[in-house]
């Protein structure tokens, strides 16, 4: 899993695959020898090969890649729609907004195609996210301090369990420099 919100050759990086997970989804006809050879090739590029079924890949990426892009894009569009003529929201948007919406600058064509290809999994994850948002809204409306605290504490704890000492969320296993 590698990339950025920018596309095209001018935005390429020779370290793009360094310590990135490279998901392999071999079909039933792929021999163990071919899978091993390809895994070794991926490893030689500095990436971390991970073998998943196509179904696992599609569900996992719906949650950790596709939904975040949908959230970022919809948040940008929400703020754009709610902002006034003086564009105060746009003007004061700072680190938090910029961090969560950076990926909204990605290629609309690419993300349109991803959403059209992984519809079932995206819809499943999106339904669960909407369910969680409804619960959060109830907690806010009811001024449920305990539920709100649990929301932020649980998300902080899970997020803090992700190794972010290297670029991206992947742990730095080696240096290719």
Regions found by a protein language model. Give the residues of each.
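Rossmann-like NAD(P)(H) cofactor-binding subdomain of soluble oxidoreductases
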Residues: 1-10
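A conserved regulatory-domain signal marking ACT and ACT-like small-molecule sensing domains
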Residues: 165-177
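Charged/polar positions within long, soluble alpha-helices
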Residues: 72, 76, 138-141, 160-167
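Hydrophobic, well-ordered beta-alpha structural blocks that scaffold small-molecule cofactor pockets
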Residues: 144, 151-163, 172
């Amino acid at each position: 899993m590698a990339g950025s919100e920018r596309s095209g050759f001018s935005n390429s990086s020779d370290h793009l695959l360094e310590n990135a997970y490279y998901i392999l989804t071999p079909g039933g006809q792929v021999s163990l020898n071919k899978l091993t050879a390809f895994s070794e090739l991926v490893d030689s590029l500095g990436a971390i090969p991970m073998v998943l079924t196509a179904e696992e890949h599609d569900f996992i990426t719906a949650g950790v890649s596709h939904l975040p892009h949908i959230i970022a894009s919809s948040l940008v569009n929400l703020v754009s729609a709610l902002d006034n003529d003086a564009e105060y929201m746009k003007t004061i948007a700072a680190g938090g907004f910029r961090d969560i919406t950076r990926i909204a600058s990605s290629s609309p064509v690419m993300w349109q195609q991803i959403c059209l290809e992984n519809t079932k999994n995206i819809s499943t994850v999106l339904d669960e996210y909407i369910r969680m948002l409804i619960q959060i809204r109830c907690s806010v409306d009811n001024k449920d301090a305990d539920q709100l605290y649990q929301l932020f504490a649980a998300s902080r704890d899970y997020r803090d369990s992700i190794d972010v000492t290297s670029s991206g969320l992947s742990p730095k296993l080696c240096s290719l420099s």
